[in-house]
Amino acid sequence: MKLSRISAINWNKISDDKDLEVWNRLTSNFWLPEKVPLSNDIPAWQTLSVVEQQLTMRVFTGLTLLDTLQNVIGAPSLMPDAITPHEEAVLSNISFMEAVHARSYSSIFSTLCQTKDVDAAYAWSEENAPLQRKAQIIQQHYRGDNPLKKKIASVFLESFLFYSGFWLPMYFSSRGKLTNTADLIRLIIRDEAVHGYYIGYKYQKNLEKISQARRGELKSFAFDMLLELYDNELQYTDELYAETPWADDVKAFLCYNANKALMNLGYEPLFPAEMAEVNPAILAALSPNADENHDFFSGSGSSYVMGKAVETEDEDWNF
């Protein structure tokens, strides 16, 4: 049997500068959940009602499911269609960070929650029809044979589907609750923003190579898929937030991020401004300059603890 030749990646010869730009951004943003002092949120966690605690665990379990999908199936499914080896490398980084995100929710659970309650949330995630439905919609395109539809599905997952869950920790943070957990979620959101942007960029680059007619078909497909996901997400939001008065605010946040997902694909917004009007407190909590003082671009912040190496000389140790 003749083996195919393997080419070594050469980062000194790059055909698309965006690959290196995004690689540098992702690696400079690298973080781990162990560096965030989640235990500082234990007192705040204990002030939440039983309903709020259960909601939080279900939200984070749903997000874990989506991260698992993106880590195990999503990003790897995009690799065979990569145009450059550098694009493959970026996608491998994306896949790994999705595993870090999934690990992060387990860190929250082990720090704040009782095992029996977490187990109940995981059982809920396997039986919740809208949650399983959105994973199935995305997965069927990942397992398909159309590279551009895979990218559309990936952008909708990264830039839209996570946000019915992301709303809750931002809401708590805006009220001074679970602020360290919110810091961790901001790190995840920062990553997802880069992922959605990059995969959307690659989608648009690939569109340049096909006919106008095919572009029109893909645009129609994208809008139809988004509407299908949106209808399902409304049902998911209603079920998830049923015992709270927050569902309408979450739905506005969904519209806001659905429009952003379309922008990542190069398309115009679908939802009018009045449907996508997000509570300013939530947008402020999302900001890199929120109360937790996170620096989205260096990976540092009031809650993220990382040691720094400083060169010393022998005389520095003469106490």
Model-identified regions with their sequence ranges:
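Non-heme di-metal
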Residues: M1-F319
